[in-house]
C-alpha cells in the first residue's frame, strides 16, 4: 500500500517538516528515526512511503526541525488513520494542528461528559475508491449530529434533509466517506452543518464560506483523505452552571459521619436534575500526619497520589461476620452522622477500626483478584513508598522522616526489606487505596453517564513531611516555606509551611513529577482548579526562620543591587540598618504599652541614639516563637510574643536568598516605622523603586518562567484547566492565561481592577469561572451581614435597588446575586452549595456563619463543615430544584 502525506506549512529559512508515527516506516515515534518531508514549494510539503496492507491503525504527527533540533510541535493528540487492507494507495491532505481557539472544548470535561455522544458509531476503515472528510467538532451536544451537505447529488444538493450524517466513533473528530464513483469529477462545494438527531432539523450551518473539494478520478483502489478540517460552530458560546462542595461536607443517610466518594453519585443526580454540568471539589488526597483534627486541612497532603481513607464508603466493603461488632459500628455510624459538623478524629478512628476488621476477615481475597493486580501494577511507583510512609509514621509516632532513624533518607532497597517485614500492615494500606480508587472511578463513570464533569483541585504546594518530599527531596526547597503576600484574607500575608519547588531540578526530566501527578488526577477528574496559579509565575517564599508572610520574597525575581537603587532611583540603601529590624523607643511604647520597659530589659540591646536590636536568641521569629512555646502562656506572654514577632517585620529590604548582595523591597513596607523614618524625598524614591519592582520590573521575566513550566504540565492530560488567579496579580498573568486558554476565576467582591469596589459580572471574560464565594470566605449571607459599610453601595449600585439595604440577605436578594452571576458571559458559573441554598428561605441554614469552610488567617482552622440537610432531602426538594432549574435555563446556561 502506498501512502502519500501532504501538509501546508510555511517554514522559515533553515526549517524542515518531519513526521513520526507508530509504524516502522515512521520510526515508531523515535524522533531520531522520523521521516523528513520534501518541500514542493508554496508551503506544500510531501512524502510517500510503502507499507504493509495489514498495518492496522496508523498514528502519526508532524513537527518542525531547525539545525537538527525540534523547535515546534503540533498541538493535541496523534492523528489516526484506519485503512482497509484492500486499498491500493491513499493520499492524505493534512492541515497543521495548532492550538485551536476553543481548546477548552477538546478537554474531557466536554468530550467525555458534557458533549459525550449518547452512542458511538462503529469505526469505519477508509475504503477503496473513496474520499474521507475528517473534521474536528467538539461542541456538539448530545442529541445533535454533524453532517455534510453540498453541491452534488451525493451530498444532497444542499437539501439538509438529504445531508450525509458523519461518523462519531473518534469524537470529537467526525468523519464521512463518500464513494468517488458517486461524485462528479470536478470541484464541488460543501459545508458542515448541525442536525437535531431525532428529526434532522437544521440547528446551524458551518459559519464560513463554502468549502471546495477537488474530486480526483477513481480507479476503484485509490482513496483520498481530507484531514485537519474544523467545523466553525455558528451557535452562541456554550455556558454552563455547576456546584462547589467538599467531599467531606456531603451528608447522606448512608454516611459514617463524613461525606464519602459514593455520596457524589447523589450529588451528580442533583446536578443533572437541575441542569448543572460540573461539581467542583476540594483536594481529596490523604492528609493523615498526626491522626488528630489538625489533619483536616486538605491542602497538606502526605502524598500527591494517594486518596484520603476518610472518603471510603466502608459499608461498601461488606459486613462483619461478628453480628455484635457490626451492630456496634452501625450504631456508631448513625451517631456520628447526626452531628452538625465532622468530628474528624472520631470518624477516622471508627473507619480505621472497621476497615482493619473487614480486611482481616476478607481483605486477602481482594488482593488476589485480577483487578487488584492491575491496580497495583499501574500504581506501584507511588503506592509502595506511600504504604511504607504510613507504617513508619505510625511506628515512630511522627510524620517527620528525619525522626525515622535509618529510614530518614529514602533508600529503595532498605524500604523493600521494610515492606517485606511489615507485610500485613503494608497490604492493609494497599487494600484501602485499591477500594478508594475503585469507588472514585465508579463515581467518575456514573458522572460521565449523566453528562456531569467532576472538577478536582491541584494544591500549589506539598507537605515537607510527605512521601513526595521523602523520596524526591531534590525536587523541593525544604529550607523555606511557600505562602502569599498580604491580601484581603491576611494583612500579615500567609505562611503555608509548605516547601517551594526546585523548578530547575524538575525541568531536568521534563517535569515528570508534575506530569505523573496530573495524569493520576485525570483518572478521576475531567477538570481541575490550579490552586494559586500565580505560583507558576513566581512563588512567595518565606525563610525557615520567619513565621509571617511579610518577610517573604518572590522566587524567582530580579533583585536589585545597591548601585542600581542608587543610580536608577536615587535611593541610597543602608544595608546595616534597613535589612534589620528598625526599633525605637516610640515603637516600643506603641507595640507594648506599659510592658515596654520589661521588653527593653529582657529582649533588646540598646545600640545608641534611641535605637535597639533584638538579642541574638530572639533575633528571628522562629526563635521568638520557640521561646514562648516552652513557657507558660497567658495574655501578657501573648502580647509580648506578638509584639516581638511584629518587630522582626520592621525592615525595608530583604536580601535575595540566591544572589547575595542584592535585595527585594519588603512587601507593604509603607506601613512600617522604618518607612516613616525616611524623609519625604527618600520615601518618594523608595516608592518608585517599590512600584517598579512589584508591578513592572519582573513582568517579562515571570512571563518567561510561566511559559517554561505551564505548557508541558497542562498538556500532559486532556482535563479542562481552570485557575485561581486571585491576589497580587502581575500584569503578565492574564496574557499567559489567555494564550494557554486557562479559565480565570472571577469573584465580584474581589475585583481585579483596583479602581472599582465590585467587579461587573456583565464584563467577565468568557474564558472564566465566576462564583459568588469560595471556601476561603463566607457565603453571600455571611458577607452581607459582616460588611455593612459596603453593602449599601452594593445594594443600590450593583443590585439596582433603592433605599436602605436590608440587614439580612433575604432569599430575593440572594436570588438576584445568583441570577447576575448566571447571566454573566463566563463559560462556567460554579456556586457553592451554600449560596444555591441561600435563595430558598425554607431550606437554607439558620446561621450562615456555620457555613464557612475555611478562615485563611487562621493556620490552625478546623475544616469540618457539613451540609445541614441530606442529599436525599435535597433531591426531594421539588420547589427549590425547579427554581434552580428555571434560573439556569433562563440565563441561557
Predicted segments, located by residue:
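Boundary detector for helix-to-coil junctions that initiate low-complexity/charged tails
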Residues: 92-101
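Acidic/polar low-complexity flexible segments
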Residues: 86-87, 229
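Generic secondary-structure microfeatures
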Residues: 9, 21-23, 137-139, 150-152, ...
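Catalytic cores of glycan-processing enzymes that make or break glycosidic bonds
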Residues: 48, 105-132, 179, 204, ...
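Exposed beta-strand face motif in extracellular beta-rich ectodomains
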Residues: 56-60, 186-190
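Aromatic-rich carbohydrate-binding modules that target alpha-glucans
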Residues: 10-55, 65-85, 139-185, 195-217, ...
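A short, amphipathic beta-strand motif
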Residues: 2-8, 129-136
Amino acid at each position: 500500500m502506498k501512502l502519500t502525506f501532504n501538509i501546508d506549512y510555511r517554514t522559515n529559512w533553515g526549517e524542515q517538516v518531519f513526521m513520526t508515527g507508530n509504524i516502522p516506516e515512521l520510526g515508531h515515534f523515535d524522533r531520531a528515526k522520523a521521516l523528513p518531508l520534501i518541500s514542493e514549494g508554496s508551503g506544500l510539503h510531501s512524502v510517500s512511503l510503502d507499507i504493509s496492507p495489514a498495518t492496522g491503525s496508523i498514528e502519526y504527527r508532524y513537527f518542525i526541525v531547525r539545525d537538527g533540533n525540534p523547535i515546534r510541535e503540533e498541538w493535541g493528540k496523534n492523528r489516526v488513520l484506519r485503512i482497509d487492507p484492500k486499498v491500493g494507495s491513499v493520499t492524505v491532505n493534512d492541515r497543521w494542528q495548532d492550538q485551536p481557539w476553543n481548546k477548552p472544548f477538546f478537554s474531557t470535561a466536554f468530550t467525555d461528559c458534557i458533549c459525550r455522544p449518547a452512542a458511538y458509531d462503529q469505526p469505519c476503515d477508509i475504503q477503496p475508491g473513496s474520499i474521507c472528510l475528517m473534521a474536528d467538532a467538539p461542541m456538539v451536544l448530545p442529541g445533535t449530529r454533524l453532517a455534510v451537505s453540498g453541491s452534488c447529488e451525493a451530498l444532497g444538493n444542499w437539501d439538509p434533509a438529504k445531508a450525509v450524517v458523519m461518523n462519531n466513533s473518534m469524537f470529537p473528530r467526525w468523519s464521512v466517506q463518500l464513494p468517488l464513483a458517486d461524485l462528479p469529477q470536478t470541484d464541488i462545494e460543501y459545508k458542515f452543518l448541525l442536525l437535531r438527531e431525532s428529526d434532522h432539523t437544521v440547528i446551524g450551518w458551518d459559519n464560513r464560506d463554502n468549502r471546495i473539494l477537488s474530486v480526483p478520478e477513481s480507479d476503484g483502489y485509490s482513496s483520498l483523505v481530507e484531514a485537519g478540517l474544523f467545523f466553525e460552530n455558528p451557535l452562541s458560546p456554550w455556558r454552563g452552571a455547576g456546584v462547589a462542595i467538599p467531599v467531606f461536607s456531603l451528608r447522606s443517610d448512608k454516611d459514617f459521619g463524613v461525606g464519602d466518594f459514593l455520596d457524589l453519585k447523589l450529588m451528580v443526580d442533583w446536578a443533572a436534575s437541575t441542569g448543572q454540568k460540573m461539581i467542583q471539589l476540594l483536594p481529596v488526597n490523604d492528609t493523615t500526619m498526626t491522626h488528630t483534627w489538625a489533619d483536616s486541612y486538605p491542602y497538606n497532603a502526605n502524598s500527591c497520589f494517594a486518596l484520603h481513607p476518610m472518603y471510603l464508603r466502608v459499608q461498601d466493603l461488606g459486613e462483619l461476620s461478628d453480628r455484635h461488632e457490626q451492630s456496634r459500628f452501625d450504631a456508631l455510624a448513625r451517631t456520628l452522622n447526626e452531628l452538625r459538623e465532622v468530628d474528624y478524629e472520631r470518624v477516622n478512628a471508627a473507619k480505621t477500626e472497621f476497615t482493619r476488621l473487614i480486611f482481616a476477615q476478607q481483605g486477602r481475597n481482594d488482593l488476589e483478584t485480577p483487578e487488584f493486580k492491575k491496580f497495583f501494577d499501574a500504581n506501584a511507583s507511588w503506592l509502595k513508598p506511600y504504604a511504607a510512609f504510613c507504617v513508619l509514621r505510625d511506628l515512630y509516632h511522627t510524620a517527620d522522616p528525619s525522626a525515622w532513624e535509618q529510614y530518614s533518607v529514602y533508600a529503595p532497597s532498605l524500604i523493600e526489606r521494610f515492606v517485606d517485614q511489615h507485610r500485613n500492615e503494608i497490604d492493609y494500606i494497599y487494600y484501602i487505596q485499591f477500594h478508594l480508587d475503585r469507588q472514585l472511578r465508579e463515581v467518575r463513570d456514573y458522572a460521565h453517564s449523566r453528562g456531569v464533569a467532576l472538577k478536582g483541585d491541584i494544591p500549589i504546594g506539598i507537605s515537607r513531611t510527605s512521601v513526595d518530599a521523602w523520596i524526591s527531596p531534590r525536587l523541593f526547597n525544604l529550607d523555606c516555606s511557600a505562602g502569599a503576600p498580604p491580601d484581603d484574607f491576611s494583612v500579615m500575608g500567609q505562611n503555608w509551611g509548605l516547601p517551594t519547588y526546585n523548578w530547575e531540578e524538575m525541568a531536568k526530566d521534563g517535569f515528570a513529577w508534575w506530569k505523573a501527578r496530573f495524569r493520576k488526577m485525570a483518572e478521576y477528574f475531567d477538570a481541575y482548579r490550579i490552586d494559586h496559579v500565580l505560583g507558576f509565575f513566581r512563588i512567595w517564599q518565606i525563610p525557615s526562620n520567619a513565621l509571617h508572610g511579610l518577610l517573604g520574597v518572590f522566587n524567582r525575581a530580579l533583585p536589585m543591587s545597591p548601585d542600581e537603587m542608587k543610580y536608577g532611583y536615587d535611593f541610597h540603601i543602608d544595608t546595616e540598618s534597613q535589612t534589620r529590624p528598625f526599633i525605637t523607643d516610640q515603637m516600643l511604647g506603641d507595640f507594648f504599652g506599659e510592658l515596654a520597659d520589661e521588653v527593653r530589659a529582657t529582649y533588646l540591646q540598646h545600640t545608641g541614639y534611641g535605637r535597639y536590636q533584638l538579642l541574638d536568641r530572639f533575633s528571628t521569629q522562629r526563635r521568638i516563637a520557640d521561646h514562648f512555646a516552652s513557657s507558660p502562656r497567658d495574655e501578657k506572654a501573648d502580647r509580648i510574643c506578638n509584639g516581638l514577632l511584629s518587630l522582626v517585620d520592621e525592615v525595608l529590604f530583604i536580601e535575595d536568598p540566591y544572589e547575595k548582595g542584592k535585595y527585594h523591597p519588603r512587601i507593604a513596607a509603607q506601613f512600617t516605622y522604618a518607612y516613616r523614618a525616611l524623609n519625604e524625598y527618600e520615601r518618594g524614591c523608595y516608592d518608585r523603586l517599590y512600584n517598579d519592582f512589584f508591578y513592572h520590573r519582573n513582568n517579562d521575566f515571570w512571563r518567561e518562567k510561566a511559559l517554561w513550566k505551564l505548557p508541558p504540565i497542562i498538556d500532559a492530560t486532556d482535563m479542562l484547566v481552570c485557575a485561581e488567579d486571585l491576589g497580587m496579580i502581575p500584569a503578565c498573568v492574564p496574557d499567559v492565561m489567555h494564550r494557554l486558554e486557562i479559565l480565570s476565576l472571577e469573584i465580584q467582591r474581589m475585583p481585579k481592577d483596583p479602581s472599582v469596589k465590585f467587579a461587573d459580572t456583565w464584563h467577565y471574560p468568557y474564558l472564566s469561572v465566576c462564583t459568588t464565594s469560595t471556601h476561603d470566605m463566607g457565603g453571600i449571607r455571611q458577607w452581607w451581614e459582616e460588611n455593612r459599610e459596603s453593602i449599601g453601595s452594593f445594594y443600590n449600585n450593583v443590585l439596582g435597588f433603592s433605599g436602605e439595604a436590608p440587614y439580612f440577605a433575604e432569599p430575593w436578594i440572594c436570588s438576584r446575586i445568583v441570577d447576575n452571576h448566571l447571566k454573566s458571559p463566563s463559560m462556567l458559573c460554579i456556586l457553592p452549595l451554600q449560596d444555591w441554598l441561600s435563595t430558598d428561605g425554607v431550606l437554607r441554614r439558620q446561621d450562615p456563619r456555620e457555613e464557612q469552610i475555611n478562615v485563611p488567617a487562621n493556620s490552625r482552622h478546623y475544616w469540618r463543615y457539613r451540609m445541614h440537610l441530606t442529599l436525599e432531602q435535597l433531591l426531594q426538594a421539588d420547589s427549590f430544584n425547579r427554581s434552580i432549574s428555571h434560573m439556569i435555563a433562563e440565563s441561557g446556561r
